[in-house]
Amino acid sequence: MGRSLKKGVFVADHLLRKIETMNSKNEKRVIKTWSRASTIVPQMIGHTIAVHNGKEHLPVYVTEQMVGQKLGEFVPTRVFKGHAGKDKKGKR
């Protein structure tokens, strides 16, 4: 079940404030955030947001196709290093 339409989308206040001030000044720089649950809104298009993956901040350049999705969807949190290889020795 999705979020109620009357509530609107969730965007962290501090993130939205930073985006709006940068838009008013026509300034582009990387914004660090830990808010993976924030929804991408049209004001964010063209900005680079560094989203935390649990270890480091990874840059995400926001495009039109990303609007409506969450920031955390574009930053993987787990690293798959492959399955264990076959044991070369036979069991005796």
From Swiss-Prot:
Protein name: Small ribosomal subunit protein uS19
Key words of the record: Ribonucleoprotein, Ribosomal protein, RNA-binding, rRNA-binding
Gene designation per UniProt: rpsS
Gene3D superfamilies linked: 30s Ribosomal Protein S19, Chain A (3.30.860.10)
PROSITE patterns xref list: RIBOSOMAL_S19
A GO biological-process term: translation
Function noted in UniProt: Protein S19 forms a complex with S13 that binds strongly to the 16S ribosomal RNA.
GO molecular function annotations of the record: rRNA binding; structural constituent of ribosome
Family that this chain belongs to: Belongs to the universal ribosomal protein uS19 family.
A cellular component annotation (GO) from this entry: cytoplasm
Domain of life: Bacteria
Record-linked HAMAP family: Ribosomal_uS19 (MF_00531)
Protein's organism: Gloeobacter violaceus (strain ATCC 29082 / PCC 7421)
